[in-house]
């Protein structure tokens, strides 16, 4: 895995995160290609790396045991050797990585130090001694979007799908996008002639908007055949590097708003572009792409359009073919897209893989557990049930609150479609999902138990009430907007929780969880396992002491995925319906 590229100030190196050692840590590779080398050998994962715009240093974020309580540190890349110097040290506080000030010496980030429920914007001075001051506060979740001399662009989340864009200039804060209803801002950045945003006011999918200096009225600049999700202005011109989500695949554009010229880079690997970093002279950019087989880094020359691979896995033990996009009609005639991953030979069986979120999307990027199962001979089907993103705001809201179980019904209809296609048999379909996808797994086997022969729940929700009560306080408000409020919807939330209907579960269930999960606490796994064991059901629990919301350590992944494959193979050998 190699991702999150950050080009150094001199353009001579690209810093990135790699799990080559078995744990995500900072690495570097020569800017024009060469041998990659580690920068630090810590014992905890590094979540991000941002190269200084002026000198040989970077800011990294580190947590402990997967708890997501990120601490910031300065990584010295000078000639005397590489060393790490902590900048924050409160393990109870989350420090969300942000952006360097353009002149260097200052780093802007978000933190919930004042109140664990909310994130304020802070400025950290890297002089000695290190000093931090608050730039923006309020009872909301704020995130750093972009930084320019004397200006700061901040996103304020009302919900995960309703974002206020704030322009901060000294003591003055301007709400750039006042709007009725809901507007999702996928990305934003300072351009040469204003602020550019990927947003969806009065439309289904996000397009390119511009806010001229001194104005809070947007101009709609460009619409794409998909959803705009990334904006990176050139450091030397008016051009914008853009990434568009087209039915899950990323399409990279170099668009100049001043002329309307739009170049599409069609060559190179196909997948999901997850991050981009310009070289300082604007001649090239480094990008991380997630595709079947791994996360890789490439350098693309702007003039020639040619790409060069910088880092990432050269090959995989059991290569997996790219998935095919298909769709079926649900009972109410809603079109449900899904990806089909074919095994290399005759299928051992069919598995349904449910993504998390729910405001997310199954895409043809790197999915290590899914690809492991495909490599083991399973046909894997990854649906985008109603409520998924990437298909417009109407589709995304089809599972809100009281509509929640309609998305579970989509899994039933998908199973029937697979049976109709003779790709599965009733009672012999496996179902796997993580996080919210784990909730969907538990809901599917408790609502339609006759369809599923085996299930794997990874860091999933068993009870929406206890989940909302125990999830990190910074998450509850945003999660209630999607699921329903404990104050007004408690009875309903309990009524649709899988734990409430656990007496209907007959499907053998493997539950995998991290002890330090701050999003979906371990209690969710423990209560469904305890309840099912008390009823004499076939259930097992695998807990990792040094993991959080998902598995990041390679040795843990190997244990978990091999265990899951063995569980599925054994339980799907004969039908349980």
Segments from the language model and where they lie:
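The conserved beta1-alpha1 loop
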Residues: 354-356, 513
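A fold-wide structural signal in alpha/beta-hydrolase
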Residues: 350, 374-384, 540
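Active-site-proximal cap/loop segments of hydrolase catalytic domains
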Residues: 385-577
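Conserved beta-strand elements of the Class I
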Residues: 15, 350-352, 510
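Local beta-strand N-terminus motif with an aromatic residue
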Residues: 348-349, 452
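Conserved beta-strand scaffold positions in the cores of enzyme catalytic domains, especially
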Residues: 36, 325, 380-382, 541-543
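Peripheral, non-catalytic segments that deliver or gate enzyme domains
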Residues: 1-346, 358-376, 403, 417-420
